[in-house]
Amino acid sequence: MDAEITITELTPDLVPAVVGLCERALDLAEDAAEAAAIVDVLWPRAAADRQVVGLGARRGADLVGVLLCSVSPTDPGVGHVDLVAVLPDERRRGVGRALLARAEAVLAERGVSEVLLAGNPPYYAWPGIDVRYTPAVCAALALGYRQDRTAWNMTADLSYDASLALRSTEAAERRLAERGITVRRAEPADLPALTAFARATFGGTWDGEVAGSVGRTGAGCHLAERDGELLGFAAYGSSRPSWFGPMGTAPAAEGSGIGGVLLRRCLRDQRAAGLDRAQIGWVGPVPFYSGSAGARIERVFFLYRRTLPAA
């Protein structure tokens, strides 16, 4: 007879074991390939500014499933399930259900009244559940979660020199220079101004994502400025090396062509790092990315929520 499943809290020394399990349990090759980055952003990095709990499911001595959850840094009554991964041969055996039930209890102990199966920016690996992880969608519905939003990524093809995503920006940069606008790579010394600009102009958590893009391996940021005044930025790699974003242009500079230049500078960096495609994450302006980089909608995510029963 199979050993029973036990759920225990994970300790930081188990990060390598969690990465190894995710490499085997994440069905989509692009996710499995970035398992180390995914675990890093959702656990050690996220724990720097929020409560994060890791749970492991064991059958006997074997780790067969993991869950990472966190409390919203802006609303302590909201918790997020950031990752659930179960080995293929352990699915449909109650492992995911047991992990999620324990996560709800752990989050409730921390004052959470509503749980989201959705990204918790600025430290997230997906906006929600990729629809191709169909068993996870079915499990969410069976456990009483309701879908309340849909999000999508766009894919930029970096696999060949003539890709629209890799078009030269030299002529556009010359035109901008004639107007006194400089475009360059951001450096760590730029972070105070960049994060203040992102926070004041766009709000949300973009300041945190920009901070996670500068001075880190596999990440980067480019900016546009005039007379020391920031006009826009584009970043990549904050959540995952293959993901682009966020990007923002000051309202006064919209229509200047800054956005397309910054975007393609980042995409060229990603190609130089060996990527043959980039994910433009949690996209808003679909027509802009389609026109500027030939990007297409590809990954689609369902975001779920559930109000926990009163104690």
Q: Where would I find each of the regions flagged by the language model?
A:
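A structural microfeature
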Residues: 65, 149-152, 232, 299
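A conserved beta-turn-beta hairpin within the catalytic core of GNAT-like acetyltransferases
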Residues: 71-82, 91, 110-113, 237-245, ...
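Short hairpin/turn module used for nucleic-acid contact or packing/dimerization
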Residues: 255, 260-311
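Acyl-donor-binding surface of acyltransferase catalytic domains
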Residues: 1, 101-177, 301-307
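A conserved beta-strand-loop-helix scaffold within acyl/acetyltransferase catalytic domains
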Residues: 27-54, 59, 65-76, 202-251
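Short amphipathic alpha-helix that is part of the acyltransferase structural core
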Residues: 1-43, 50, 54-58, 63, ...
